[in-house]
Structure formats: structure tokens, C-alpha cells
Regions:
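Glycine- and other small-residue-rich loops at beta-strand/loop junctions that grip anionic moieties
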Residues: 56, 82, 107-108, 129-132, ...
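Buried hydrophobic positions in well-ordered alpha/beta secondary-structure cores of metabolic enzymes
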Residues: 24, 71, 89, 104, ...
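N-terminal "arm"/small-domain region of PLP-dependent enzymes with the aminotransferase-like
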Residues: 2-61, 69
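Well-ordered alpha/beta subsegment
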Residues: 76-77, 103, 137, 141
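Conserved PLP-anchoring active-site segment centered on the Schiff-base-forming lysine
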Residues: 96-114, 132-133
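PLP-dependent aminotransferase-class I/II
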Residues: 116-155
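Short helix-loop-beta connector
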Residues: 74-78, 98-101, 146-147
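Conserved N-terminal alpha-helix of the aminotransferase class I/II PLP-enzyme fold
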Residues: 40-88, 113-121
Length: 155
């Protein structure tokens, strides 16, 4: 890995952080592995709750870990998750934050997949959504209920 303590500029962080110099490659090579050897060390890390243990590519990979490290360096974050699609990111975030009985206020012009998630899928789990006009803050305020957990706006 690059010594990220010496990277000060945004561009330098974008290029150099999260880089895994395997085989003297300047940038992290693209790995097409879907599974990784389950060593005792990796298993122990996974069992202890390590978030970025290399076990299976859908959970973590050398490449997704490199992207996450770059995002953290550029944004000053502690950790990051990467997803293969926007809907993967949206649905994972909403499902992890909401429970049966919770409510969302969302903008009327969300992406069609988001609309379907909020109006067809989440109600099956007892999560309701009220649509509001994002151009009118008063409509958001009027839609807030006692059980509202998320105000959702897409741009």
C-alpha cells in the first residue's frame, strides 16, 4: 500500500491511495477472482467481524477494497462500501436503516427503481413511504409522521 500520510492533494489521493503494488504494478491490477483461499487468518478475521476480509468477491475483493480506500482518502472517511449498482446501494442502505413500522418521506420524482422499491417492496416489510415535492420544503414537513426515519431526495 502507498504511504497515505504524505498525500495532501485531492488528485494525489485519488491516484495513489488504496494502491496495492502487486508484481511492481503502479496501480492495483484488475483481479477477476471470485473466491479466495480461506486461510486461518482470514477465517479468524471474518469470524471477528472484519468488514473487508477476502472470502468471496460479492463481499469484498482486492479491487473493491482499493476503491473504498481511495474514497476514504479523498473524502476523509473511516470506511466505505462499494456496490455494483445504484439500486444495490440504495436498497442496502434503506433496508439496513429501516424496520417494520418505519416511514420514509421521498421526492415524487425518484428513479423508477427506487419508486418501485419504496411503493412495492418495502411495504411488504411494514415500511411505508409518502411522496412529497422536493421543490417545496413545506410538503416534506407536512409528510413527516411520528415514525418517519428517513427524508429521501435524489438529484
Amino acid at each position: 500500500m502507498t504511504d497515505e500520510t504524505n498525500l495532501s492533494g485531492f488528485g494525489s489521493k485519488a491516484v495513489h491511495s488504496g494502491t496495492n503494488h502487486i508484481g511492481d504494478a503502479v496501480n492495483t491490477p484488475i483481479f477477476q477472482s471470485s473466491t479466495y483461499k480461506l486461510t486461518d487468518e482470514r477465517y479468524a478475521g471474518w469470524a471477528a467481524g472484519a468488514q473487508h476480509t477476502l472470502l468471496y468477491a460479492r463481499l469484498s475483493s482486492v479491487n473493491s477494497d482499493a476503491v473504498a480506500a481511495k474514497l476514504c482518502a479523498m473524502e476523509g472517511g473511516e470506511d466505505a462500501e462499494t456496490f455494483s449498482s445504484g439500486m444495490g446501494a440504495i436498497s442496502t442502505t434503506l433496508v439496513s436503516l429501516l424496520s417494520n413500522g418505519d416511514h420514509i418521506v421521498a421526492s415524487t420524482d425518484v428513479y423508477g427503481g427506487t419508486y418501485g422499491l419504496m411503493t412495492e417492496e418495502l411495504p411488504r416489510f411494514g415500511i411505508s413511504t409518502t411522496m412529497a415535492d422536493m421543490r417545496d420544503p413545506a410538503s416534506y414537513e407536512a409528510a413527516i409522521q411520528e415514525n418517519t426515519k428517513i427524508l429521501y431526495i435524489e438529484t
